[in-house]
Amino acid sequence: EVIMPAYTFVSTADAFVLRGAKAVFVDIRPDTMNIDEKLIEHAITDKTKAIVPVHYAGVSCEMDKILAIAEKYHLLVIEDAAQGVMASYKGRALGTMGDFGCYSFHETKNYSMGEGGALLIRDEKNVENAEIVREKGTNRSKFFRGQIDKYTWVEAGSSYLPSELNAAYLYAQLEQAEEINKKRLSVWNRYWDGLGKLADEGKIVR
Protein backbone atom coordinates (compact mmCIF):
# COMPACT_ATOMS: atom_id res chain seq x y z
CA GLU A 1 0.00 0.00 0.00
CA VAL A 2 1.16 3.50 -0.87
CA ILE A 3 -0.35 6.60 0.73
CA MET A 4 -0.99 9.61 -1.50
CA PRO A 5 -3.37 12.59 -1.71
CA ALA A 6 -6.86 12.14 -3.12
CA TYR A 7 -6.26 15.19 -5.30
CA THR A 8 -3.47 14.57 -7.80
CA PHE A 9 -2.94 13.68 -11.45
CA VAL A 10 -3.58 10.04 -12.31
CA SER A 11 0.12 9.38 -12.98
CA THR A 12 0.84 9.45 -9.25
CA ALA A 13 -1.38 6.43 -8.68
CA ASP A 14 -0.59 4.73 -12.01
CA ALA A 15 3.09 4.42 -11.13
CA PHE A 16 2.22 2.08 -8.27
CA VAL A 17 -1.04 0.43 -9.35
CA LEU A 18 0.55 -0.79 -12.60
CA ARG A 19 3.07 -2.67 -10.46
CA GLY A 20 0.55 -4.33 -8.19
CA ALA A 21 0.47 -1.87 -5.31
CA LYS A 22 -2.67 -0.39 -3.78
CA ALA A 23 -3.10 3.38 -3.77
CA VAL A 24 -4.48 4.60 -0.44
CA PHE A 25 -5.96 8.07 -0.82
CA VAL A 26 -5.87 10.64 1.96
CA ASP A 27 -7.87 13.87 1.90
CA ILE A 28 -6.24 17.23 1.24
CA ARG A 29 -5.93 20.53 3.07
CA PRO A 30 -8.22 23.23 1.62
CA ASP A 31 -5.56 25.92 2.08
CA THR A 32 -2.77 24.25 0.07
CA MET A 33 -4.58 21.51 -1.91
CA ASN A 34 -1.88 19.16 -0.58
CA ILE A 35 -2.19 15.98 1.46
CA ASP A 36 -3.39 16.65 5.01
CA GLU A 37 -0.45 15.51 7.10
CA LYS A 38 -2.73 15.14 10.14
CA LEU A 39 -4.63 12.31 8.41
CA ILE A 40 -1.67 10.25 7.24
CA GLU A 41 -1.15 8.15 10.37
CA HIS A 42 -4.80 7.01 10.28
CA ALA A 43 -4.18 5.52 6.82
CA ILE A 44 -1.10 3.49 7.77
CA THR A 45 -1.47 -0.29 8.00
CA ASP A 46 0.98 -3.18 8.23
CA LYS A 47 0.99 -3.20 4.41
CA THR A 48 2.02 0.43 3.98
CA LYS A 49 5.37 0.83 2.25
CA ALA A 50 5.59 4.50 1.29
CA ILE A 51 4.10 7.98 1.51
CA VAL A 52 3.87 10.08 -1.66
CA PRO A 53 3.48 13.78 -0.87
CA VAL A 54 2.44 15.73 -3.98
CA HIS A 55 3.59 19.35 -4.01
CA TYR A 56 0.59 20.68 -5.90
CA ALA A 57 1.30 23.72 -8.11
CA GLY A 58 4.74 24.00 -6.53
CA VAL A 59 3.31 24.59 -3.05
CA SER A 60 5.16 22.42 -0.58
CA CYS A 61 3.58 19.81 1.64
CA GLU A 62 4.41 19.95 5.35
CA MET A 63 7.56 17.91 4.87
CA ASP A 64 8.93 18.05 8.41
CA LYS A 65 5.80 16.36 9.75
CA ILE A 66 5.59 13.89 6.87
CA LEU A 67 9.24 12.90 7.22
CA ALA A 68 8.76 12.42 10.96
CA ILE A 69 5.81 10.08 10.34
CA ALA A 70 7.80 8.14 7.75
CA GLU A 71 10.71 7.73 10.16
CA LYS A 72 8.38 6.61 12.95
CA TYR A 73 6.85 3.86 10.80
CA HIS A 74 9.94 3.07 8.69
CA LEU A 75 8.32 4.14 5.43
CA LEU A 76 9.82 5.47 2.21
CA VAL A 77 9.00 9.01 1.15
CA ILE A 78 8.64 9.53 -2.60
CA GLU A 79 8.10 13.20 -3.40
CA ASP A 80 5.94 13.97 -6.41
CA ALA A 81 7.52 17.31 -7.24
CA ALA A 82 6.31 17.26 -10.85
CA GLN A 83 5.24 20.89 -10.49
CA GLY A 84 7.90 21.79 -7.96
CA VAL A 85 11.09 22.45 -9.92
CA MET A 86 12.75 25.57 -8.43
CA ALA A 87 10.34 25.60 -5.46
CA SER A 88 11.50 25.03 -1.90
CA TYR A 89 10.48 24.21 1.66
CA LYS A 90 12.38 25.97 4.45
CA GLY A 91 15.34 26.47 2.13
CA ARG A 92 15.36 22.90 0.79
CA ALA A 93 14.49 22.19 -2.83
CA LEU A 94 11.31 20.19 -3.35
CA GLY A 95 12.15 16.67 -4.42
CA THR A 96 15.34 16.50 -2.35
CA MET A 97 13.97 15.69 1.10
CA GLY A 98 12.53 12.21 0.63
CA ASP A 99 14.11 8.95 -0.45
CA PHE A 100 13.12 9.72 -4.03
CA GLY A 101 12.04 12.89 -5.80
CA CYS A 102 10.21 13.08 -9.13
CA TYR A 103 10.27 16.06 -11.49
CA SER A 104 8.23 16.48 -14.67
CA PHE A 105 9.35 18.25 -17.82
CA HIS A 106 6.02 17.84 -19.60
CA GLU A 107 5.06 20.65 -21.97
CA THR A 108 2.76 22.23 -19.37
CA LYS A 109 5.55 22.66 -16.82
CA ASN A 110 7.69 25.76 -16.26
CA TYR A 111 10.74 23.97 -17.68
CA SER A 112 9.80 21.66 -20.51
CA MET A 113 11.16 19.13 -22.98
CA GLY A 114 7.76 18.01 -24.22
CA GLU A 115 7.65 14.87 -22.10
CA GLY A 116 9.84 13.09 -19.58
CA GLY A 117 11.19 14.03 -16.20
CA ALA A 118 13.92 13.36 -13.66
CA LEU A 119 14.29 10.98 -10.73
CA LEU A 120 16.27 12.16 -7.71
CA ILE A 121 17.66 9.34 -5.57
CA ARG A 122 18.96 9.78 -2.02
CA ASP A 123 20.56 6.36 -1.43
CA GLU A 124 23.29 5.47 -3.90
CA LYS A 125 22.42 1.77 -3.66
CA ASN A 126 19.19 2.48 -5.57
CA VAL A 127 20.89 4.23 -8.49
CA GLU A 128 22.01 1.07 -10.29
CA ASN A 129 18.52 -0.42 -10.30
CA ALA A 130 17.07 2.85 -11.61
CA GLU A 131 19.61 2.83 -14.43
CA ILE A 132 18.62 -0.73 -15.34
CA VAL A 133 14.92 0.14 -15.47
CA ARG A 134 15.70 3.23 -17.57
CA GLU A 135 17.88 1.25 -20.00
CA LYS A 136 15.22 -1.29 -21.03
CA GLY A 137 16.20 -3.69 -18.27
CA THR A 138 19.87 -3.86 -19.24
CA ASN A 139 23.10 -2.88 -17.48
CA ARG A 140 24.04 -0.71 -20.45
CA SER A 141 24.93 2.27 -18.24
CA LYS A 142 27.73 0.23 -16.66
CA PHE A 143 28.96 -0.67 -20.14
CA PHE A 144 29.11 2.99 -21.17
CA ARG A 145 31.16 3.74 -18.04
CA GLY A 146 33.59 0.94 -18.88
CA GLN A 147 32.68 -1.09 -15.80
CA ILE A 148 31.80 -4.20 -17.86
CA ASP A 149 33.01 -5.42 -21.27
CA LYS A 150 29.49 -6.05 -22.61
CA TYR A 151 25.98 -5.35 -21.47
CA THR A 152 23.10 -7.76 -21.09
CA TRP A 153 19.45 -7.92 -20.06
CA VAL A 154 19.14 -8.36 -16.29
CA GLU A 155 15.51 -7.62 -15.38
CA ALA A 156 12.30 -5.99 -16.59
CA GLY A 157 12.64 -2.40 -17.67
CA SER A 158 11.54 0.09 -20.29
CA SER A 159 12.89 2.96 -22.37
CA TYR A 160 13.02 6.21 -20.43
CA LEU A 161 15.75 7.96 -22.40
CA PRO A 162 15.06 11.38 -23.94
CA SER A 163 16.49 12.31 -27.30
CA GLU A 164 19.62 14.46 -27.26
CA LEU A 165 17.66 17.23 -29.01
CA ASN A 166 15.00 17.31 -26.29
CA ALA A 167 17.65 17.14 -23.58
CA ALA A 168 19.49 20.10 -25.11
CA TYR A 169 16.23 22.07 -25.29
CA LEU A 170 15.64 21.44 -21.58
CA TYR A 171 19.24 22.09 -20.58
CA ALA A 172 19.14 25.57 -22.10
CA GLN A 173 16.10 26.37 -19.94
CA LEU A 174 17.69 25.01 -16.78
CA GLU A 175 20.71 27.23 -17.42
CA GLN A 176 18.29 30.19 -17.33
CA ALA A 177 16.05 28.77 -14.61
CA GLU A 178 16.49 31.67 -12.19
CA GLU A 179 15.61 34.24 -14.86
CA ILE A 180 12.62 32.23 -16.10
CA ASN A 181 11.37 31.88 -12.53
CA LYS A 182 11.79 35.60 -11.92
CA LYS A 183 9.72 36.51 -14.99
CA ARG A 184 6.97 34.06 -14.10
CA LEU A 185 6.81 35.44 -10.57
CA SER A 186 6.47 38.96 -11.99
CA VAL A 187 3.48 37.86 -14.07
CA TRP A 188 1.95 36.12 -11.06
CA ASN A 189 2.33 39.25 -8.92
CA ARG A 190 0.60 41.30 -11.59
CA TYR A 191 -2.42 39.01 -11.50
CA TRP A 192 -2.38 38.87 -7.69
CA ASP A 193 -2.30 42.63 -7.33
CA GLY A 194 -4.73 43.26 -10.18
CA LEU A 195 -7.36 40.88 -8.82
CA GLY A 196 -7.02 42.18 -5.28
CA LYS A 197 -9.97 44.55 -5.59
CA LEU A 198 -12.30 41.76 -6.71
CA ALA A 199 -11.12 39.62 -3.79
CA ASP A 200 -11.73 42.46 -1.34
CA GLU A 201 -15.26 42.81 -2.71
CA GLY A 202 -15.87 39.10 -2.18
CA LYS A 203 -16.35 38.42 -5.88
CA ILE A 204 -13.46 35.96 -6.11
CA VAL A 205 -11.34 33.91 -3.72
CA ARG A 206 -7.60 34.02 -4.12
What function would you assign to each model-found segment?
Residues 103-104, 117-123, 171:
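Short beta-strand-to-turn element immediately C-terminal to the catalytic PLP-Schiff-base lysine
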Residues 38, 42, 50-54, 59-65, ...:
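PLP-dependent aminotransferase class I/II
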Residues 1-81, 88:
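PLP-dependent aminotransferase-like
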Residues 45, 94-95, 111, 159-162:
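Alpha-helix termination/capping residues and helix-transition junctions
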Residues 79-113, 142-144, 149-154, 205:
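Conserved active-site segment immediately N-terminal to the catalytic lysine
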Residues 7, 21, 28, 82-83, ...:
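Histidine-centered beta-alpha loop that forms part of the nucleotide-sugar donor binding/catalytic region
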